[in-house]
Amino acid sequence: MLRACQLSGVTVAAQSCLCGKFVLRPLRPCRRYSTSSSSGVTAGKIAGAGLLFVGGGIGGTILYAKWDSHFRESVEKTIPYSDKLFGMVLGSAPYTVPLPKKPIQSGPLKISSVSEVMTDSELPMAQTQETNGDTPASAAGDPAPEVEHEDTINTECPNTDEGTSTFVTAALAKSLEDALNQTATVTRQTITAQNAAVQAVKAHSSTLKTAMDNSEIAGEKKSAQWRTVEGALKERRKAVDEAADALLKAKEELEKMKTIIEDAKKREIAGATPYITAAEEKLHSMIVDLDSVVKKVQAAQSEAKVVSQYHELVVQARDDFRKELDSITPDITPGWKGMSISDLAGTLSTDDLNALIAHAHRRIDQLNRELAQQKATEKQHIELALERQKLEEKRAFDSAVAKALEHHRSEIQAEQDRKVEEVRDAMENEMRTQLRRQAAAHTDHLRDVLKVQEQELKFEFEQDLSEKLSEQELEFHRRSQEQMDNFTLDINTAYARLRGIEQAVQSHAVAEEEARKAHQLWLSVEALKYSMKTSSAEMPTIPLGSAVEAIRVSCSDNEFTQALTAAIPPESLTRGVYSEETLRARFYAVQKLAGRVAMIDETKNSLYQ
């Protein structure tokens, strides 16, 4: 494989020097330079050597491109149509997102109860190498470059690949650093909230113990103590709720960070393994610190639960004892326990005292029996608790051992990946050195071949250029004539359309004038009809002179309208006519009288007689 890669280096270096603008065709130049005496043998040897050289170079290039994706990317960028060849032989290239990244030195993130996250100043950045690779921009007809320029490009192409790889690695490191900073900030806040919850739980337990121990205090002091206990309980609930919310948020951030690390692993970026390993170590430290502080909160809550149960049992025992005393001495005023002995001397009788003493003896015997039974029971409970504790400690020990083994395996894997990366870099450097040497050894031969190709391509280019120019000139004249004809046709069409628009506008104006006159006539007739319908109380008749005059004015050029208005009697114009309302009212009056007349029979009798 190394020999094939060395052979491929010549082709890749030569083609990368010329930016992939020319194709190597060694047979024709060799035939032109061959002498007449040994043309057959020399041509066959050169043809065979050329085919072997080109085939070995292409095969070695494909094999090395399959092993190194960055080398494949550089060849695809430098040599045209090489991406299609790689796609047919090797398939599609793995996709890598070129994000800006800054390489950082890996370091463990130590988070204590007040965790501190390493900032940018604590994570020194590696200096990125500046890329000085010139962008190839030679055209098809440019002369072949000199040997010195080829060597320069051969030297700078690896630097360009190195700079691209460093750029991608730096972007990955920057993204991991930002995600770690955010996760560490949330974890630190969560740890602070958990510690505050522990302090609140301990404060509540302490105040509750104090209030239960000082049972002899009565009055306002006792009330103040219980108010303090209630306040501590509220603070405890608030702190525990805040700690739970912060813990959920921290778990979400840790899951996001874990997803980011897994995505970075899947991308398989060269040189990114140290940063991914450092991020995993810091994430593991955060998880361990968070678990420890959560265990502290759980332990504090367990202790507080025991104190609360103890308080409930004490309160229940006091209530039971008070009920027993009330049943023994029902005549004594409640609350006698707070009285002094001198006050109780005249209150309790001999029978009451004997009853209290007898009850105290029975109670002591009962408590002694319960104490003995409790001791035996607790002994069994202690044995069971010890067994459970041993099992829990064994499980915790197994879990701790598993975590330690996992951490150790991750460290070994990281070290192995680091060594593999170093060996890979050394192999790449050696391969690039061999490629440069092979390219320098065959530069003279390539220069001669490329000069011949340059002359051929220049001749072909000039011939194609003259043909294309003549075709373009003919095409230009044809398109100019077509545009002139189309322009003339468009002008004629627009002129005809303009004439049609003018005629349509004139006819529309005449129609609008006729419609306006008809509308005025209609309005005048409607006014006349309205005046004939309505009337006022002072004037039963309505003169029609003004309405008729309006009709005459609006239709002065209409003979039919003038004849119709002239036929109206002058009395109607001056005196007026009865309106429709007046006639309707008179008709109703006449109808009423006619109805009354109809009620008179043949004998002239009616309801009025």
From Swiss-Prot:
Domain of life: Eukaryota
Residue numbers of Phosphoserine PTMs: 112-113, 175, 340, 342
Residue spans crossing the bilayer: 46-65
Record bears the keyword Transmembrane: yes
Gene Ontology cellular component annotations, sorted alphabetically: MICOS complex; mitochondrial inner membrane; mitochondrial intermembrane space; mitochondrion
Transit peptide segment: 1-33
Family: Belongs to the MICOS complex subunit Mic60 family.
Protein name (Swiss-Prot/TrEMBL): MICOS complex subunit Mic60
Organism: Rattus norvegicus (Rat)
